[in-house]
Amino acid sequence: MCGITGWVDFKKPLVREQSVMEKMTETLSKRGPDDTNIWGKHHVLFGHKRLAVVDIEGGRQPMTRTHQESCYTICYNGELYNTEDLRKELQKRGHQFKGHSDTEVLLHSYMEWKEECIHRLNGIFAFAVWDEERDLLFAARDRLGVKPLFYSEQGTSFLFGSEIKAILAHPEVKARVDRQGLAEIFGLGPSRTPGNGVFKGIKEVRPGHAMRFSKDGLTIWRYWNVKSEEHTDSFDETVENVRFLFEDAVTRQLVSDVPVCTFLSGGVDSSAITATAAKHFEKEGKAPLHTFSIDYEDNEQYFTSSSFQPNADGPWIKKMSEAFGTVHHHCVISQKDLAAHLAEAVIVRDLPGMADVDSSLLWFCREIKKDFVVSLSGECADEIFGGYPWFHSTEDVKGFPWMRSMEERIGLLQDTWQEKLNLKEYVMSKYEETVHETPLLDRETGEEKRRRELFYLNMLWFMTTLLDRKDRMSMGASLEVRVPFADHRLVEYVWNIPWDFKMHGNREKGVFRKALEGILPNEVLYRKKSPYPKTHHPAYTKAVKQWLESLLNQKDSALHVFLDKKKLDQLIETEGASFQVPWYGQLMKGPQLIAHLAQIHTWFETYRIDIEE
């Protein structure tokens, strides 16, 4: 994986602006510590930071190639998993390659098929190509949004970058937030409306979208979405197809010129990836697979079971490691480190995030990076197979089901800001927009249509939030993380599997569990879903409480501008006792809300944000 950034201005020669591009590129250093390069020509500049994974010597970027006497230059962040298939097809069409990188194959794919090349790609990507022949920039983002791509139009300039910080490094861009951005932070955070960059004037290319910038202006279009069709396969055929698509996705994503490991929590998703990878390693005669798990200091003493998190991971991790002969690394984070990484997690994300759910992952990825460059992880399984508790609720609630306690959260704001931001209406409008966009089948029942809406909401919102988290925290550690469940072929197929198949045996993700019979140990295969682990230690609550109190001692804290002092004091004094049910997702309760508010302060202070009312 890498960091990319660029600047196009048809009204201004950019050959003397290389120092600006160097600053923009340097902000992405953690995404690519292995190499730095700047490329420029006339009215375009590209910057690239590389994390070398495939074709260490031959994959340097930005990369320029010539085809039919025209030059094309690419800067690319991602990984293609059908590189060799594309290479063979392109060679048949007369293309010659200098190395074996996927970057070169992607560039030649554009040279051959132009914008239509994106339909042929299997992978995770965000890339930009300068097409000298047509004097335009083409950019695209992968179908599920695993890799990020932000952009901004500033006068006659068009800017893009893997992260917001690259765009903010440009002298024409100011860190400003208007009412819409504030509504994103206080109403939807830590999620974001698809395409919204929160900072005024900064947007994000939505998953499955592409863009073209030329002298005629900016054009953006959607090139992919799930398609609703009748599922005609029998249950047994469905199980077989799910198994094949999943195993093929994992196997394709094990290709690397550097060592690969897996995350292992003992849940069915990470265990399925680990089992498939371990079998492949054994078949290829490779050394045993290394697996990694995270736990918290004194967790065995303070762990508290709940409907969201019924049990700790340890016993299931041990069963998996023993069953597949992995070399397991049990990483234990202290409460001190957990709290200490909260502020940095904001900078890595460029936004207030998921509190210790972020900071623990940032620390964990750095532990993995000590020995590995690439890891596979189980994100997206619950969104596509229906694993979350809200998929199984009988309540037909209008609104995002992973966002609870909205009244209480909004109530923390001062009355004037509650009136200005009108958060209930803002959040509901975003919900309705997504529901209206859901691909439906006319002949489906009302219940079936509602299920599609729920899956679509999860795919566009909750899944994207978790993919953002995984990308920023892993790249903040210079670790590449791949997500087999985001293989678009698997997502497209599972989208149309009927609910009674998905719930086979009256178990969440039943069809996927059936596909894994004989592969996973039964104890792991039928373990009730448990989310990413979290701390229950009172020392963490005390630490974030003291942190927020210290920030509030600063008279110029942005929190004083927005929050009701009495209610904020009460939140701190009670250690968030009124938020016993997770207010976001499955993990974020009172202590996480306290930490999240401290992250909001850190964001305003670090980025020196101007507020436009």
Role assignments for model-derived ranges:
Residues 43, 55-58, 73, 122-129, ...:
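Conserved adenosine/adenylate-binding substructure
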Residues 306-309, 345-347, 389-398, 612-613:
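Short secondary-structure boundary/capping segments
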Residues 38, 148-151, 272-275, 384, ...:
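Generic hydrophobic alpha-helical membrane-span motif
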Residues 1-343, 348, 361, 517-518, ...:
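Cysteine-centered catalytic environments shared across enzyme families
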Residues 385-409:
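A mobile, often basic/glycine-rich helix-loop segment
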Residues 1-4, 8, 22-23, 71, ...:
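Adenosyl-5′-phosphate
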Residues 17, 82, 99-102, 121, ...:
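Hydrophobic (often cysteine-bearing) scaffold residues that line and stabilize catalytic clefts
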